[in-house]
Amino acid sequence: RDCLLSRGLGDVYKRQYKDADASKRVRIHSSKESYDILKTFYEDCMQHHEECWAMYLNGAGRLLGVSCVSRSGMNSTVVDIRIVLQTALVSHASGIILSHNHPSGSTVASTPDNNLTSQLKKGCEAIGIQLLDHIILTEDAYLSYMDEGML
């Protein structure tokens, strides 16, 4: 589960389902399903430091892969949206679900969280990829930008 920052961007696609039949890929139907899948990637950091992971989906909503796009400090993480978008292009994704954790346990979106979402949405629109959701995770709860009408 190494971060895919500047190298190996295609590894996420190769590692997740490259040879799998499309019908065997997990289909994401809800933010709860996204949370349940994503939470497993945050096991080592949920209460210690922030990380940002992205899920990449095909046009049918089936999971192509999951990639760590940033690991940072206790209260914030820096996300380069170009990395998120590049990985989406390499994996031939039609949609992205961005996520990050709040070690504080709060599911309240911050101004930087909102700014990141806005910037990523603009980037996605420019290249024909849909930002499907941005999920803020804690140990026992989550906030979905889509569910809250914030996307």
Where are the model-predicted features located?
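Single conserved hydrophobic/aromatic residue that forms the stacking wall/gate
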Residues: 1-13
